[in-house]
Amino acid sequence: MKRGLMLIDRGSREREAEEELEIICKKVKEKGNYDFTEFCFLEVVPPFIEDGMEKCLKKDIDEMTIVPYFLYPGKKVKIAVADAMKYQKDTKIKFLVSKPMTMHRTLVDLVDSRIVSALKENEISLSKDKVDVLVIGHGSMDPN
């Protein structure tokens, strides 16, 4: 069975976003034994969902996993998944959709690592228990 993976990100004009997604796709491809991996963007810059899906559907695969590369579900994530799933009716490829990233123990480690890095980069010698942290999320207009 040949498998593909599509990461759907919000999109950013920052070149680093694309570079990081390329690295993530490469590593997930190796780790998950995917025949190919691609990424696309919901908005801001191409490749957009239509571009990514059309490219994927040209591949000789049996199954494609779609990963919404967002922390939490919301209106935009639901739109992204719905847009991707529109292509299901025109193909024999089986689509699997994962949940967005959501809560995972590695996120706690990541936040902790960012705090430690910020303290070092700013030459602040406080212990972590003396530091207040404000976490800012994007938010969603989705009532569900």
For the regions a protein language model found, what residue spans apply to each?
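Active-site-proximal alpha-helix that buttresses catalytic centers in soluble enzyme cores
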Residues: 1-144
